[in-house]
Amino acid sequence: MDKRTEQAFAYLEKNEHSMMELLKNLVSIETPSADREANERIAAHLDTYCDALGMERQIHHFEKAGPTFAAWTRPQEKKPILLLGHMDTVHAVGKFGPEPFLVKDDRVY
């Protein structure tokens, strides 16, 4: 294993708990595509999270659709990385049962 890979695995191991908490928080905010309020909640959650990291961010609101969210860091000497995703879970609230995020036998469901 090369040095960069070792560093990446060490970082992941060191930060596993906080990353799992973030994932749990995000997954637990059910956001059906047509539920504008739910999508506003997850955008606000991401905004608060990224603000705490010192990131620049912006929520874009639309008249006929839920928001989009963008966050970025100030330019640095290193090459930028783009992460792209979606905030809606598509399915209706409650479709995944009482626990939309579950850890069982060291696996996340």
Predicted feature descriptions by range:
Residues 2-109:
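Acidic/His- and Gly-rich active-site-bordering loop/insert found
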